[in-house]
């Protein structure tokens, strides 16, 4: 098993969310609105792990349902 730090994991999850979001043709605003937020700040900051912001499991569950992607896909390196 790889030696993965929490920071590395959070960054990879953010990159994977961004990849699948773009594949589905959604903007950060589109995804934010679908998640119930009125601003892109949650998605934009967490996709790049800005100031330590990261997606929590509830975010990932919502995103997987919106994007129709298995939640496990977000954890792949």
Model regions and ranges:
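A short, Lys/Arg-rich alpha-helix, primarily the initiator
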Residues: 1-23
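Helix-turn-helix DNA-binding elements, focusing on the entry/boundary residues of the two helices
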Residues: 17, 28, 57-60
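Residues within the alpha-helical elements of helix-turn-helix
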Residues: 23, 34, 66
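Short alpha-helical "recognition helix" segments of helix-turn-helix
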Residues: 30-33, 63
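Short, basic-rich loop-to-helix N-cap that marks the start of a DNA-contacting helix
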Residues: 49-65
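Short C-terminal boundary/hinge segments that cap the last helix of small helical domains
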Residues: 57, 68-77
